Amino acid sequence: MYVCVRTDLGLGVGLKPTHGRVPFTGISSGDAMTDHAGPLARTTLEAATCLDVISGYDGIDDRALGGSKPGSTRFAAALQQDHNQLDGFKVGIVVEGFDHSAVDPYVKGAVMTAVQKFKELGATIEEVSLPEHLHGPAIWTIQQRIAGAQTLLGQNTGRRGLYMTEMEHARLPWTDDGFQRAFPSTKNVIINGLYLMQRFPGLYGKTANTGRFVSDKYEALFEKYDILVMPTTPVVAPRHGKRELPLDSLRPSMGLTINTAVFNVTGHPALSIPVGFAPAKEDNQVMLPVGMQIVGGLWQEEKILRAGHAWEAHFDWKTMHYSIDKN
């Protein structure tokens, strides 16, 4: 078994648990309200096995005060006993997650093709609209800039937990030389965070309240649907490499979180599984993996794991090369 613990989502099978299910102890915080840590693995079963191990309040991190008792979850065992069918499952296709202008047509097609395969497993599929989904990136960006700047400047307070004092000692105080050597995204957080705090006092609280509103909207949907689906990222992975200008360094990541940032805000669990290939933007002869994001209600990891595991059991994503001409 090959697994690692990551923050947010990445390539492979990535699982972002409900906020607070996994303690954040020992991980550098961006914003305690949106901090999530979870497994990155080769399969859904491996991710579930890792989640069983790392879940539960550790007696240190107050984010996890509402979590389960360590060692009490049985996500992996439930998958191993499952018959890999989804009879009675209701799947909602979030149209805002597919129809955003940033979503590449190849990615949209590949994920929509994968979603339709849930029908073969016994699930019913419906389109659902949630306009508030589109507010997620703006809410998350503001929170990350303000809270991130406070953290980077050593001004984060108000948590019961383990503070990373060794890291703070190495980073602080900021000097001009240290700031110039920082990655452009770090400079972006500090400059924009300070600007927002100075020009828009009280803005962080407004975004926090708006985030609760969006979370409630999603919870209402989960009274009707077992899972919601959409592309994980709007495009396949951009070309990696050093870029000369700061803006060029930031540009490849712009817009990548249009479907993921909102669930950092709301705290809902989300699973990303690979469902095929689509051509790279820089070279359409290069085919790169496409991820489908499966989202569940708060503390409903079992449902998203079950859906991901069933899809994996019946379909081989490595053979699925999406072509607009053929679909």
Residue positions per predicted region:
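Short, conserved charged micro-motifs
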Residues: 301-304
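Amidase signature
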Residues: 53-261, 265, 279-284, 299, ...
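Short, loop-centered acidic/histidine patches that primarily coordinate divalent metals
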Residues: 273-278, 295-297
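Short glycine/serine-rich loop segments
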Residues: 1-57, 265-275, 288-291
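Short, well-ordered beta-strand elements within core beta-sheets of diverse protein domains
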Residues: 35-42, 192-198, 293-296
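Generic structural signal for residues positioned in beta-strands
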Residues: 14, 90, 189, 291-293
